[in-house]
Amino acid sequence: MDTDILVIGAGLAGCACAAAAAEKGGKVTVVEKTSSWNGRGGGFGAINSHYMDELGIEVDKVNAKQHWIAQCASRANEDLIVKFFNSSEEASNWLLAKAEAVGGSAMVGAFYSHDDVYAEQPGYHMLMIPEEAGLTSTGFAGAELCYNDAVKDGAEFVFDSPAVQLVKDGTKVTGCICEGKDGYVQYNASKGVVLCTGDIGGNLEMCKAYAPICVEYGQPRSQYTDRKST
């Protein structure tokens, strides 16, 4: 199967990626191991969204980044943290526009820690979507909004299709092989493969390889975690 952009995983990240690529005209295929898209949690964190602007809330990005890195004992991926802070405003306003398009809005919560040592930043956004918008999930509305828009713009979602192996051309990842009900299917992406498969917290092998400090705290398992991974 050939596509432009292959997205592995249909959670919030995967649905958002698919929606963003499809709205720009890309041929997008999303493969997901469960039987539906997924979205959990009631809200999302953002830095300096337009809702925060309207409330007069401004986050000092430099101070907040330094505090975040310090709380992680300087073991975090600083490049990734910087990218979050620099891209958060644009990305959050993009998602908020999708909520507003169906008559929704967002509440910016004030329930965050003001402690000097474990201080948090304002910016928790809870999406408020009217019933007449017709959303079907009790999970995070943002994921469903992105899924609906991605489908509307032509993205294809293939469910019950876990990716079992990445396909490479030299050092470049060019696709993946999925195991579906009718056997194995190879997907080839001409423009890129995006991994949106969540964290590795439930995978003992990957924790040992990439985050051994996590191993001593035990490996939680949920319905989203392959029993063999633990």
Model-identified regions with their sequence ranges:
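Short glycine-enriched loops at secondary-structure junctions
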Residues: T34, H50-M52, F111-S113, V193, ...
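N-terminal Rossmann-like FAD-binding beta1-loop-alpha1 element of flavoenzymes
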Residues: I5-T29
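Glycine-rich FAD pyrophosphate-binding loop
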Residues: A22-G43
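Short, solvent-exposed loop/turn and secondary-structure capping segments
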Residues: G39-G43, S49, L204-K208
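Loop/turn elements at helix/coil->beta-strand transitions in domains of secreted/extracellular proteins
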Residues: D2-I5, K24-K27, K152-E156, S190-G192
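Glycine-rich loop(s) and the adjacent beta-strand/alpha-helix scaffold that form part
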Residues: K181-G183, N188-S229
